[in-house]
Amino acid sequence: MTRLLSLIILVTITVQMAFAKISFSTELLNSANQGNVEAQYDLALCYYYGYGCNVDYESAFKWFDGSAQKGYYPAIYALSICYEKGHGCIRNQELAFSLCKLAAEKGMNMAKNRLGILYEKGIGCEKNVGNAFKWYNMAAQGGDAEAQFNVAFFYKHGIGCAANADSAFFWYEKSAVQGVADAQFNL
């Protein structure tokens, strides 16, 4: 009964968090101006995606940078995306790579997968499929669905690793369960 109650509470919290959306507000702006790194990051997300305001990459970059300067790793990862795409700043793929690697090394799963992509495509670094596989695998182990698909694809085709149909199936299945359509197609 205790396990069931814990599961119900966990599912309820997860659903509430999924439907909670950051939105621009005076309170958020005030908190960001007072130096709250999470508020700065959330405000940057509002500007980046247009949550409750107009999309403004320059303002997003400013707030991501402020939060990143204080060591907030989600903001460091977000800055890497800004530099990679030239959103709110001059495009700098080498800096994008360095920032993404920093966030990945600090344990950000999303950054690990993105770092794999950067290595695979040679964006901001020398192309290295072995390193791409390594970072995809770390992100996949952490539950990242896209990384699980990438690991499966690499195993299927022997990219950066020895081809292994059983491992490919295992990772396609993990990714498919999380809703990745390409993984579902490959099963």
Model regions and ranges:
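Boundary at the C-terminal end of the N-terminal hydrophobic targeting segment
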Residues: 18-20, 25
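Short, intrinsically disordered, charge-balanced linker/junction segments flanking boundaries
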Residues: 181-187
